[in-house]
């Protein structure tokens, strides 16, 4: 497989929308929504922290330096952007809580502010969040482009959007996935096991994005072409699909088509199950009750069946499925932005956007779907 970055298809077919977005503390805000309410009792202090100009890992290092707490004793639910104003929850042993107020000034000098203090009986672990609320400010936006943006948002609210991994997953030079494959091939290795695991996960993410883009391509072809043309297309791809199945696929109202054998999942969380009754599952998908999932390959990954598997297998790698420390999983192909709010400020030529996404989903994926950056070919089947 070609490991160079290829344009990823969009869900919707509008032309590129021209505006400026700067990922900065003024124009990009991220607020973590916790998975559960904190009990206000227990051996772990839980602080809500506001930061800017620091990555989550850099923030943890600051806490370690100022409070004397070991980084391993600190708990957090997820990584937050460096170039943004972000809030997130961090847990630390209760004994360090009195030091927080004493070091308020020292923390503020490092762009950290404690917004609240609570207590809980367990340490916060990775993944212990519901999702994130986002705010983005777009600049140099004309009234016409603001109108176009509103129209795209209406589609996203109605149908959702592709759940692509964001570019930050792949590093400054977009080569993390290549390093991950080299680790699997025993061509390179780093001293820190967490770094090795992260780079391997970047390769998983690259395969997932590529599979999702391929599925969007197939969905667009099913929608755009006649039954006869579709039969010829699937025949050329050595994919076995009969005319009755194709009719069912064309009748699906959602732009992302559910295929026989897809691994579905209840949304926003729940159990996996196989898509066997396509008409029924496509209706539930429209209602945002279930979502098809894509492969994050690994030793214990759950694989699709039938037609879905025939497409998915091109995005597997035997080194992932045999790697002892890479268990594998599945990820929503599609997510739904919630609580979407927008405002166009004509005199400033600015467009303000707020929305909520479930954990693991990227604001940059929504930005990509709105903007349709020039040079990204969305019509190439």
From Swiss-Prot:
One cellular component term from this protein's GO annotations in UniProt: cytosol
Domain called TRUD: residue spans: 160-335
Catalytic reaction equation(s): uridine(13) in tRNA = pseudouridine(13) in tRNA
Active site per database record: 81
This protein's UniProt keywords: Isomerase, tRNA processing
Class of this enzyme: isomerase
UniProt EC number: 5.4.99.27
CDD domains xrefs: PseudoU_synth_EcTruD
Gene3D superfamilies: TruD, catalytic domain
One Gene Ontology MF term: RNA binding
Chain's role: Responsible for synthesis of pseudouridine from uracil-13 in transfer RNAs.
Record-linked HAMAP family: TruD
Protein name according to UniProt: tRNA pseudouridine synthase D
Gene: truD
């Amino acid at each position: 497989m070609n490991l160079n970055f290829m344009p990823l298809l969009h869900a919707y077919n509008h032309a590129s929308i021209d505006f400026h977005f700067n990922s900065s503390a003024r124009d990009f805000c991220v607020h973590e929504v916790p998975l559960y309410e904190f009990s206000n009792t227990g051996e772990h202090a839980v602080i809500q922290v506001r930061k800017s100009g620091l990555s989550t890992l850099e923030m943890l290092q600051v806490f370690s330096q100022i409070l004397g707490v070991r980084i391993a004793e600190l708990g957090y639910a997820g990584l937050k952007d460096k170039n943004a104003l972000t809030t997130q929850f961090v847990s630390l042993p209760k004994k360090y809580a009195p030091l927080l107020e004493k070091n308020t000034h020292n923390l503020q000098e490092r762009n950290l502010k404690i917004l609240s203090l609570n207590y809980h009986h367990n340490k916060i672990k990775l993944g212990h969040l519901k999702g994130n609320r986002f705010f983005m400010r777009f600049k140099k936006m004309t009234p016409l482009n603001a109108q176009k943006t509103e129209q795209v948002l209406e589609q996203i609210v109605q149908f959702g959007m592709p759940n692509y991994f964001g570019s930050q997953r792949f590093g400054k030079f977009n080569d993390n996935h290549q390093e991950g494959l080299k680790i699997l091939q025993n061509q390179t290795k780093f001293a820190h096991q967490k770094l090795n695991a992260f780079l391997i996960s970047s390769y998983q993410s690259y395969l997932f994005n590529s599979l999702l883009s391929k599925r969007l391509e197939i969905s667009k072809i099913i929608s755009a072409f006649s039954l006869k043309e579709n039969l010829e297309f699937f025949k050329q791809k050595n994919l076995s699909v009969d005319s009755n199945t194709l009719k069912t696929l064309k009748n699906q109202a959602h732009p992302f088509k559910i295929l026989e054998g897809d691994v579905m999942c209840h949304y926003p969380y729940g159990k996996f199950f196989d898509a066997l009754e396509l008409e029924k599952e496509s209706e539930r998908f429209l209602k945002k009750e279930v979502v098809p999932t894509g492969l994050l390959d690994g030793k214990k990954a759950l694989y699709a069946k039938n037609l879905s598997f025939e497409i998915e297998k091109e995005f597997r790698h035997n080194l992932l499925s045999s790697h002892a420390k890479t268990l594998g999983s599945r990820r929503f192909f599609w997510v739904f932005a919630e609580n979407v709010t927008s405002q166009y400020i004509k005199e400033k030529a600015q467009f303000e956007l707020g929305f909520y996404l479930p954990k693991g989903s990227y604001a940059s994926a929504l930005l990509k779907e709105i903007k349709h950056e020039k040079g990204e070919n969305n019509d190439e089947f």
